[in-house]
Design a protein with these regions (language model features):
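Conserved short histidine dyad/triad with adjacent acidic residue
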Residues: 121-127, 136-152, 171
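Transition-metal
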Residues: 1-18, 94-113, 137-139
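Short alpha-helix capping/helix-loop boundary micro-motifs
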Residues: 46-50
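C-terminal, non-catalytic macromolecule-binding modules
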Residues: 73-127
Length: 203
């Protein structure tokens, strides 16, 4: 009874062109852009109105600690998380939602999201600081023909986001991944201008 009028108001605002992607009305309407159902409206719609709406520029990042309710609304992203079997859903999904456990674990303290630009490690590689011992993430940007050598401390994964590279005589293109063993020294040669992301376990 409460959600339907809210969605109707959102639809009117979008139709008038008075809202942008920085307004929760825009996203609430997008979820039900094909029509507002008469029953069983997803209660997760409420979360759009209480969460921060954050636009993360290309190749920038954000760290979200345990207990932070979040949703990815648009675009492509890389998500790293600690090994866990207790992921809880808050809505916007047909899957089961354990409300009691969700309330128990969610951190209800207001936050001011901070965009991570990355810290320079070398001319080619930047590190996104993550204040946890479970994982780390770097971005490697190479010009065409450039060769870059990395030494792995742990089991590491490389994801090619843009371009094409040769890693130890094997060709990789955008969307491909390579798994590196611990204590390996690997040469990456960029066939074209290339961007890769490296996931690793910190020392």
């Amino acid at each position: 009874a409460i959600l339907k009028p809210l969605l109707e108001e959102a639809a009117k605002a979008v139709a008038k062109g008075t809202v942008t992607k920085n307004d929760p009305h825009w996203w609430a309407h997008k979820y039900y852009a094909d029509g507002i159902p008469t029953k069983n409206i997803d209660k997760g719609i409420f979360s759009i109105y209480i969460l921060n709406i954050v636009n993360i520029p290309k190749y920038k990042g954000i760290f979200q600690g345990a207990g932070i309710l979040h949703a990815y609304l648009e675009g492509q992203n890389i998500e790293l998380m600690a090994n866990s079997d207790n992921v809880l859903r808050g809505g916007l999904t047909p899957k089961h939602i354990d409300v009691k456990e969700l309330i128990h674990h969610v951190n209800f303290v207001p936050t001011n999201p901070s965009i991570l630009k990355g810290d320079k490690l070398t001319d080619q590689e930047i590190n996104y600081p993550c204040p946890v011992p479970d994982f780390g993430l770097t971005k490697i940007a190479l010009n065409q023909g450039e060769v870059y050598t990395i030494s792995s401390y742990s089991l590491e994964m490389l994801l090619v986001m843009d371009g094409e590279v040769i890693i130890e005589d094997m060709a990789y293109k955008a969307g491909d991944t390579a798994l590196l063993t611990a204590n390996a020294k690997v040469k990456i040669k960029a066939h074209t201008a290339t961007v890769l992301f490296k996931a690793y376990v910190p020392k």
